[in-house]
Amino acid sequence: MERPSGAFAAAYLGGKQNDYDALNSGKAINGTVESWREMHELARQSTPGNVVETLSSFVDLDNLIDYMLVNFYGGNDDWDSHNWYAARKRKPNAKYRFFCWDSERTLENAEGDDKTHVNRVNNPSFLFNQLLRDESFRQRVLQRVQLHFFGDGALTPERAATRYLKLANEIHNAVVA
C-alpha cells in the first residue's frame, strides 16, 4: 500500500503534492497542522446542535464514518493514537479525508476487540464521537452501516471473503517462494 502522503493525495484526489496538508497520526508530513488544530478546537467548543455544521466544513463526513466503520469492523488493536493518515487540500472549505495505515493488528480477536468506544483527543475518534452527539449524524452512520454491512455491501461476509481470497491468490506464489 502506498503511504497516504501529499503525493498520494495529489495522485488520487487531484492537484499537486504541495497543495495538501497531509498528516501521519497528527503530525504534518506535508503542509501544516494549522487547520487540524483549528478543527479540533472548534470540535471541543461545539454543541450537539452545531457540531455537524461546524465540522462538515473541515471533514468529509461519509469518509470519516467509513474510516471508523473499517476500524471497528477489524477491531484494529493498533490504532487511533497512531497508525492513521489524513489529508486535505490547503484551501478554504477543503475537507479532510482519512486513510487506514499499518493495520496488521486487525481481525485478531473477534470476541474481545470492541473498538467502538475509542475516543482520543486530537485523533479521528474524537471527531467521530463529537459528531455522534447529533441525531442526524447518528442516522447518517446507520445509513452507512446499512450500505456496507447488508445486502451487497463491501463488508458483508460474502464480499469480504471474496476480496480476501483474491488478495491471497495474488500473493500466493510470493509467499510460497
Model-predicted segments: where are they?
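C-terminal catalytic region of ATP-dependent kinase domains
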Residues: K91-A177
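Predominantly extracellular/lumenal beta-strand repeat domains
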Residues: Y12-L13, D19-N24, N50-E53, A86-R88, ...
